């Protein structure tokens, strides 16, 4: 692992696949021009509409998204963490996986994860979200991809961040960097987003790269923004605020080693 710049992109995706991919391309280009070697895209970057719309277009979204990610990685010679996007479930009409993927600069897929924790909640602002109505939960733990260049990358998606046992599993598999792409609601995000990300970073002494959605996507769907990169001590290295853009910061193996030596909590676990 070497020091490198990572970027967490922040988008306002809408129910328009073509426009969303165009926005994503512009932000990837911006990140690469600023020196990023690892670029993260938020949950629902390719399409953010209601669940019925998303399911009706799931095959088209998945096909276009996979081609787009391969093309972007090759064109910009950058590693891309992307998720999630809908991927149809074979033999299950009316269901798709919420999928994250890791793409190498040559366009090869290095890792894939289907979100296991589905967002079925009644938010106090009056909105109800029932992800399981159209999304099939993944059945496997998320992967940790072991990279000589970028460290060990652990995948997750949005609502997963509320389940610390998932990230403890990733840390036990050697994760150095935790990927948390999200479309956090505006209501929950203002109180929970930053706290949860810092907690996952601190308790696992890992970097966190958290791309995000922001703003108004369609009627009654507003997201929090604040894409972030956080160091293993819980320090916020970059915050994209509330407008589309990016958070960019250095991932440094010396800092990772320093924190783990100064606060060796992973070595002190009793209940493992």
Curated annotation (Swiss-Prot):
It holds the Pfam family CN_hydrolase. Coiled coil: none annotated. Signal peptide: none annotated. Hydrolyzes deaminated glutathione (dGSH, 2-oxoglutaramate) to alpha-ketoglutarate (alpha-KG) and cysteinylglycine, alpha-ketoglutaramate (a-KGM), and no activity on glutathione or L-glutamine. May function as a metabolite repair enzyme. InterPro entries: C-N_Hydrolase, C-N_Hydrolase_sf, Nit1/2_C-N_Hydrolase, UPF0012_CS. Its EC number is 3.5.1.128. GO terms for molecular function: deaminated glutathione amidase activity; N-carbamoylputrescine amidase activity. It is an enzyme of class 3 (hydrolase). It comes from the Bacteria. The keyword Oxidoreductase does not apply. The keyword Hydrolase applies. GO terms for biological process: putrescine biosynthetic process from arginine. The active site is at 43 (proton acceptor), 115 (proton donor), 158 (nucleophile). It catalyses: N-(4-oxoglutaryl)-L-cysteinylglycine + H2O = L-cysteinylglycine + 2-oxoglutarate. Residues 1-253 form the CN hydrolase domain. Belongs to the carbon-nitrogen hydrolase superfamily. NIT1/NIT2 family. Keywords: Hydrolase. This is Deaminated glutathione amidase.
């Amino acid at each position: 692992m070497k020091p490198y710049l990572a970027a967490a992109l922040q988008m306002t995706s809408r129910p328009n696949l073509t426009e969303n991919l165009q926005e994503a391309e512009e932000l990837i280009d911006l990140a690469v021009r600023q020196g990023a070697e690892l670029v993260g895209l938020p949950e629902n970057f390719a399409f953010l509409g209601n669940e019925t719309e998303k399911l009706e277009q799931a095959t088209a979204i998945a096909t276009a998204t996979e081609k787009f990610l391969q093309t972007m990685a090759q064109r910009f010679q950058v590693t891309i963490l992307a998720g999630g996007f809908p991927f149809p479930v074979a033999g299950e009409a009316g269901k798709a996986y919420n999928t994250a993927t890791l793409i190498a600069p040559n366009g090869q897929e290095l890792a894939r994860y289907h979100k296991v924790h589905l967002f079925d909640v009644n938010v106090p602002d009056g909105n109800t979200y029932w992800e399981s109505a159209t999304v099939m939960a993944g059945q496997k733990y998320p992967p940790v991809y072991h990279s000589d260049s970028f460290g060990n990358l652990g995948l997750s998606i949005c609502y997963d961040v509320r389940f610390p046992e998932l990230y403890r599993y990733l840390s036990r598999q050697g994760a150095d960097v935790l990927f948390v792409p999200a479309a956090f609601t505006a209501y929950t995000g203002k109180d929970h987003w930053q706290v949860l990300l810092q907690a996952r970073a601190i308790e696992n002494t890992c970097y966190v790269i958290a791309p995000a959605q922001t703003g108004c996507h369609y009627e009654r769907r507003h997201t929090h923004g604040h894409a972030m990169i956080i160091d293993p001590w819980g320090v916020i290295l970059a915050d994209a605020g509330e407008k589309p853009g990016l958070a960019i910061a250095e991932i440094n193996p010396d800092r990772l080693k320093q924190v783990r030596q100064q606060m060796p909590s992973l070595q002190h676990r009793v209940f493992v």
